[in-house]
C-alpha cells in the first residue's frame, strides 16, 4: 500500500485488504486508511469482513452476483442482519452480540458504540 500512497492517487481500490492479516496488521491497516482519508482521497474497499467495514467505512454497498442488493450508510446496512444473512454475510460481531439482548432501540455496529452502550446500560 505504501508504494501506491506515494503516487498520491485520487482513488484507491483495496480488494480484501484484511485477508491474511493478524489483528495487529488490521489495526495498522486501519491507521493507514485513516491517513489516506485525512487527505480527502476516495477509497473503494471490497471485503467480507463486516467488523473491519464497520470500523472504517461511511457508506456500504452489498453486492451479490455482481448486483447491488443493499446500500446506504454503514450503520443502517451493517445492522440489517436479515439483509446480510440473506446474501451470505454476517453482521459485525458487536451487532450480533447485542441483538441477543433484545429490547434495544438501536443496535451498535462499531466496537466503540458497543462500549458506550454497555456503559450506559450498566449505569441504569
Kindly label every feature range from the protein language model.
Residues 53-55:
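A short, surface-exposed alpha-helical micro-motif characterized by mixed small hydrophobic
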Residues 23-25:
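Helix N-cap at the start of a conserved alpha-helix in ABC-type nucleotide-binding domains
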Residues 71-72:
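ABC ATPase "signature
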Residues 65-66:
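Conserved ABC ATPase "signature" C-loop
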Residues 12-15:
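Catalytic Walker B motif of ABC-type/P-loop ATPase nucleotide-binding domains
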Residues 84-124:
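ABC ATPase nucleotide-binding domains
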Residues 47-48:
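H-loop/switch region of ABC-family ATPase nucleotide-binding domains
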Amino acid at each position: 500500500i505504501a508504494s501506491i500512497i506515494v503516487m498520491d492517487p485520487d482513488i484507491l481500490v483495496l480488494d480484501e485488504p484484511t485477508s491474511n492479516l493478524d489483528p495487529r496488521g488490521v489495526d495498522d491497516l486501519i491507521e493507514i486508511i485513516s491517513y489516506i482519508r485525512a487527505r480527502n482521497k476516495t477509497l473503494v474497499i471490497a471485503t467480507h469482513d463486516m467488523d473491519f467495514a464497520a470500523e472504517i467505512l461511511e457508506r456500504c454497498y452489498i453486492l451479490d452476483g455482481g448486483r447491488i442488493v443493499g446500500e446506504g450508510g454503514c450503520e443502517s446496512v451493517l445492522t440489517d442482519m436479515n439483509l446480510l444473512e440473506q446474501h451470505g454475510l454476517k453482521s459485525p460481531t458487536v451487532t450480533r452480540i447485542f441483538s441477543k439482548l433484545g429490547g434495544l432501540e438501536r443496535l451498535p455496529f462499531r466496537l466503540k458504540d458497543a462500549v458506550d452502550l454497555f456503559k450506559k446500560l450498566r449505569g441504569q
